[in-house]
Curated annotation (Swiss-Prot):
Organism: Synechococcus sp. (strain RCC307)
Lineage: Bacteria, Bacillati, Cyanobacteriota, Cyanophyceae, Synechococcales
Subunit organization: Part of the 50S ribosomal subunit. Forms a bridge to the 30S subunit in the 70S ribosome.
Family: Belongs to the universal ribosomal protein uL2 family.
Gene name as annotated: rplB
Organism superkingdom: Bacteria
Function: One of the primary rRNA binding proteins. Required for association of the 30S and 50S subunits to form the 70S ribosome, for tRNA binding and peptide bond formation. It has been suggested to have peptidyltransferase activity; this is somewhat controversial. Makes several contacts with the 16S rRNA in the 70S ribosome.
Protein name per its UniProtKB record: Large ribosomal subunit protein uL2
Amino acid sequence: MGIRSFRPYTPGTRTRVVSDFSEVTRRKPERSLVVAKHRRKGRNNRGVITCRHRGGGHKRLYRIVDFRRDKHGVVARVAAIQYDPHRNARLALLYYTDGEKRYILHPAGVQVGQEVVAGPEAPIEVGNALPLSAIPLGSAVHNVELYAGRGGQMVRTAGASAQVMAKEGDYVALKLPSTEVRLVRRECYATLGEVGNSEVRNTSLGKAGRKRWLGRRPEVRGSVMNPCDHPHGGGEGRAPIGRSGPVTPWGKPALGLKTRKRNKPSNKFVLRKRRKTSKRSRGGRDS
């Protein structure tokens, strides 16, 4: 994948940096693997906004992605690499020898025409899916299962990968992209390699309109609201928030408050917590 920038013909193109889509080999999706999906627009089943700043955007078709990789021992050929509007990663269209077609997350380096396979006896090659017990130490993996047979739930975004650190008993220690070291059952499956399209972190939308195309509505600062709408609101002119620290619209502490439960049962599987991020890297945006 590569990225392309633009000359400053307009204010929107001055800082615009987008993907060149050079790795995409086929534009139209496989019709048997797409379904229509209702856009929730940040509402729940009662129509109440539960996630702010969502709505609008371009109409999309949802691609059915195979996160389970449960066709063990059946060889598949990579027929195409395609764009997916619902994620930053690309999709690889697989043609299995028994005639079935499936989408998987595109592993970095996998080319059209290459063969991939899943199963405990699969060779140690990028794009193949194996149980963690069969993957060598130090290998990079993605699309990692938390529970055997449920499908990959971790390490699925563009450019992400986890590292196999150790094996002991029924568990394998993985170093996740967040630097957290976590134990996972050895029978859980993972795909070798890292997710492709790692250059997406270098892109820039360039203008507010592109954010609207993605279905993101504007975020209004709390300090410019009325006091009935936000704890930061009110006052004469540009008044301070009048609190020791920023809070959410519902009065809860913002920017750094830990939201994970202290007595969560899965805490025993976390060997090392993720590294803390500084305020500078996290950003001090007014909620």
